[in-house]
Swiss-Prot record:
One Gene Ontology term, aspect cellular component: lysosome
Positions where Phosphoserine occurs in the chain: S179
Family stated for the protein in its record: Belongs to the ferritin family.
Catalysis: reaction(s): 4 Fe(2+) + O2 + 4 H(+) = 4 Fe(3+) + 2 H2O
Coiled-coil blocks: none
Superkingdom of origin organism: Eukaryota
Functional description taken from the UniProt entry: Stores iron in a soluble, non-toxic, readily available form. Important for iron homeostasis. Has ferroxidase activity. Iron is taken up in the ferrous form and deposited as ferric hydroxides after oxidation. Also plays a role in delivery of iron to cells. Mediates iron uptake in capsule cells of the developing kidney. Delivery to lysosomes is mediated by the cargo receptor NCOA4 for autophagic degradation and release of iron.
Record-given protein name: Ferritin heavy chain
One Pfam family it belongs to: Ferritin
UniProt: Fe cation 2 binding residues: E63, E108, Q142
Protein source organism: Bos taurus
Modified residues (N-acetylmethionine): M1
Gene that encodes it: FTH1
PTM annotation (N-acetylthreonine): residues: T2
Record keywords, A-Z: Acetylation, Cytoplasm, Cytoplasmic vesicle, Iron, Iron storage, Lysosome, Metal-binding, Oxidoreductase, Phosphoprotein
Amino acid sequence: MTTASPSQVRQNYHQDSEAAINRQINLELYASYVYLSMSYYFDRDDVALKNFAKYFLHQSHEEREHAERLMKLQNQRGGRIFLQDIKKPDRDDWENGLTAMECALCLERSVNQSLLELHKLATEKNDPHLCDFIETHYLNEQVEAIKELGDHITNLRKMGAPGSGMAEYLFDKHTLGHSES
C-alpha cells in the first residue's frame, strides 16, 4: 500500500478533523445501511407496509447523500478518505412500525451526537469552515429528523401500536402515504 501524497490544497485542516470526518462518513453509511434494512423489511409480503418501506428508503438515500457530501468536503479540504467496514444492522427483523421508528430515533440521536462532537472538535481546532459546513448542512436537518420521528412515535402510540395492526396500517396509509418523503 502506498501512502497518500500530501495535498497542495490543504489549509487549516487538522488531522484530527480529517480522521473525525472519516468516522462520520462511516456512521452516515451505517445509518443508510440500517434504513435500507428497514425499508426492505416493510416491503416483505408478510409485512406489506409500502409507505413505511418508502419512508425508510428515502431516509437511506438521505444518509448516503450525507456521506457523499462529507467525502466531497474531505477532498475539497485536502484530506484523504479512508473507508472502513460498515457494521451490519443490529437486527434483521424490525418487528413493527413503532419499533422501527424507535430504532430510527435512537440512530438519528446517535448521528446528531457525533455531529455535535465533530463541531466541537472543529471549534477547538479553530476551523470556521468546518463549523459552518456542519451548521449549514447537518445540524438543523438532524433536529428536524429527530422531531419528525418523535412525532411519528407519539402518533403510533396514540393509535394503539404495536398492539394494533390496524394502527400501523392506517398510519402507513394516511400519515406516511401523504408525507413528502
